Every structure is written in structure tokens, then in C-alpha cells.
Regions:
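Sec/Tat signal peptide C-region and signal peptidase I cleavage site
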Residues: 20-24
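N-terminal Sec/ER secretory leader and immediately downstream segment
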Residues: 29-108
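Bacterial N-terminal signal peptides
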Residues: 8-17
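Bacterial N-terminal signal peptides that target proteins for export
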Residues: 1-9
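A generic structural signal for short, non-catalytic loop/turn and secondary-structure boundary residues
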Residues: 8, 65, 179-181
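Long, compositionally biased interface segments
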Residues: 196-243
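Aromatic-patch recognition
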Residues: 73-196
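Hydrophobic alpha-helical bundles in membrane proteins
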Residues: 4-5, 25, 39
């Protein structure tokens, strides 16, 4: 583990003290957190997660700003039911402190696997087969699809809410030129463990020998769900291929 991720409760909250009202309140929060965290405490001894103060439309998170409950592997231990999110700009997993607006960040190497809601994620360190950061994994069989999401801080004087930035911001401001744009990259992992990047629905189906049957199965699903998202399309293809 890198030294920057081994902070005691005292040093962690010393970093936060400048943003909190008074030392007595800081100490009270430290004590309350230590009591509530219990054997999870080591999970929270990380560097404080970034709190972006720049004025920009959108947000830097994977899907939404709020935290969701999930399970996470950290230093070989599995921790259940902790509030997790992903900073897609910095490619860091965020774990929210108990009863606090603050979070700690974990690198991909230190958070190799976790769940957020129904999603399953893996952390990829430098030199891996996939881009460094976090990817969501689809599929339970011998083949998988990996979805890598990252955010970029961009600038545009036009109204780019919605498709141009990749998602809709209900609080979009036309007088703000900077925004967090989203990018999504998909990879196919075959049964031998080889990765290949693909773009589009047909490209995924071409990865399989039994593509004719898979295409028929997926078309039947699309007739029932004409607005099937690309992620759900990937899951449907993998489910059909596993039959």
C-alpha cells in the first residue's frame, strides 16, 4: 500500500479540520466515527477524496453524485454494505465516512473488486490489459464485457447538455462554459482471457461463432424492449451466448 493511503484517524481528520466548524466538533466526529466503523476502520484510513470547487456543469462521478451501498475488497478483506462511488475524473473509488460529507479515495490497486448496487466493478492498475482505473463487468459465464467510464473536464460556449456530454444535467447553466464530459469504452474478454475493444452492437455479436442464434435471441428481446440500452444489450448477448 502506498504511504499516502496509510493515514491514521488523527491525520485524516487533521486534513478535514479546516473545513469543519471547531476542534471540539472535529474530535467528536473522530470519536463517533471510530465507534461506528468498528472493524471497518482500516478501510477509511485513506487520502481524503477530492471535493471539486471549480464551476462546471455536470459532475465528475461515474453515474451520479450520491453514494450507493455496496461490498468492497480492500487489502484482501471483504467489507459489506459500505457507501461507495467512483470519481471517474480521477479514477478513484470513494468510500463515504460515517455521518459525514467527506470520503476517502482508494486507488484501483487497493480496490480490486467491489459492487455498487447491482453493478460489479474491478480496479485495473498501471500496465494492465485495460485502461488504468475502474471497469464494470458484465456476464457470469466464461466471457465478459468490461465497460470503462472516464470523465474529462471540457469547455464549450454552446449548450451541450444531454448527448454532447453524454448525460443530462438537470441543473445545467448556460452561463457556465466548462463541463464534465463522459466517455465510455467497451472491451470483450474471451474464454482464454484475451481482451479486444469493440464499438457497437454488431461488433459484439461478431465475437461469437453462434452469432446467428444470438442475434435472433437479442432481436426477440428488442421487440419486447425497443428502447434497450447498450449496456442491457451487452448483458442480453452474454446471457444468450451462455445458453
Amino acid at each position: 500500500m502506498k504511504k499516502s493511503l496509510i493515514l491514521t484517524f488523527g491525520s485524516l481528520f487533521a486534513l478535514l479540520a479546516g473545513s469543519l466548524p471547531a476542534p471540539a466538533q472535529v474530535q467528536a466526529e473522530v470519536q463517533a466515527f471510530q465507534q461506528s466503523a468498528g472493524d471497518r476502520s482500516i478501510l477509511y484510513r485513506g487520502k481524503r477524496g477530492a471535493r471539486y470547487t471549480i464551476l462546471a456543469n455536470g459532475h465528475p462521478y461515474w453515474a451520479q453524485p450520491g453514494f450507493e451501498r455496496g461490498d468492497i475488497v480492500f487489502e484482501g478483506n471483504l467489507y459489506y454494505d459500505v457507501p461507495i462511488n467512483i470519481d471517474a475524473l480521477a479514477q478513484r473509488a470513494l468510500v463515504q465516512l460515517q455521518d459525514s460529507p467527506f470520503s476517502v479515495e482508494l486507488t484501483p490497486e487497493n480496490a480490486p473488486a467491489f459492487t455498487i448496487g447491482d453493478g460489479h466493478f474491478v480496479g485495473i492498475g498501471p500496465g494492465g490489459a485495460l485502461p488504468e482505473g475502474f471497469s464494470e463487468v458484465f456476464g457470469d459465464g466464461p466471457v465478459h464485457v468490461y465497460k470503462h467510464v472516464y470523465k474529462l473536464l471540457s469547455s464549450n460556449t454552446q449548450n451541450v447538455n444531454g448527448d454532447p456530454i453524454g448525460y443530462y444535467d438537470p441543473d445545467y447553466r448556460n452561463d457556465v462554459t466548462r463541463h464534465f464530459a463522459i466517455r465510455k469504452v467497451y472491451y470483450f474478454r474471451d474464454a482464454e482471457g484475451n481482451f479486444s475493444r469493440f464499438k457497437g452492437r454488431s461488433a459484439l455479436i461478431r465475437q461469437f461463432q453462434d452469432r446467428k442464434r444470438i442475434r435472433q435471441d437479442v432481436k426477440a428481446i428488442q421487440r419486447r424492449q425497443p428502447d434497450l440500452s447498450f449496456d442491457d444489450f451487452c448483458k442480453a448477448v452474454l446471457h444468450s451466448a451462455a445458453q
